[in-house]
């Protein structure tokens, strides 16, 4: 149990900004595998886009479902975003999700894995608000 808990907890490390002497907060994931990392990645996306999260249970039919494979380097920088399943009726959603992931970089650094690839399912409502399958509140 301790190992599982440690794998999903994230620690904060203060890093000096180059040449400025200022301090920047950088999040590090202690996940030991891609499955455990999903929660850290999802929490980071939720924190980055808090105003765009769909609150409560999603409607029975969501507007779009996007399945994404994200590859990160050891520092949490996004190396690639591969769309595994895309909504053909809503290509704008696909591009928006891709751009949101890139702009959220760096994600928590997967230091125990030296980089990772993980999958996430984005559930997008007609309003444009979303939930990630990892942290979804379910559907009505």
Predicted features and spans:
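N-terminal signal peptide c-region/cleavage motif recognized by signal peptidases
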Residues: 15-19
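Bacterial N-terminal signal peptides that target proteins for export
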Residues: 1-8
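Short, small/polar residue-rich loop motifs at catalytic or cofactor-binding pockets
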Residues: 60-67
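Repetitive helical segments and hydrophobic/amphipathic motifs
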Residues: 11-12
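A short acidic/small-residue loop/turn micro-motif
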Residues: 84-92
């Amino acid at each position: 149990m301790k190992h599982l808990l440690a794998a999903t907890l994230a620690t904060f490390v203060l890093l000096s900004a180059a040449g400025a002497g200022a301090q920047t907060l950088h999040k590090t994931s202690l996940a030991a595998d891609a499955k455990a990392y999903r929660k850290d990645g999802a929490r980071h996306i939720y924190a980055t886009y808090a105003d765009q999260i769909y609150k409560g249970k999603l409607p029975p039919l969501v507007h779009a479902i996007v399945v994404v494979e994200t590859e990160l380097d050891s520092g949490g920088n996004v190396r690639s975003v591969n769309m595994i399943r895309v909504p053909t009726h809503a290509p704008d959603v696909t591009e928006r999700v891709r751009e949101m992931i890139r702009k959220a970089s760096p994600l928590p650094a997967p230091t125990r894995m030296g980089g990772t690839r993980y999958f996430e399912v984005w559930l997008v409502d007609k309003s444009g608000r979303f939930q990630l399958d990892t942290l979804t509140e379910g559907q009505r």
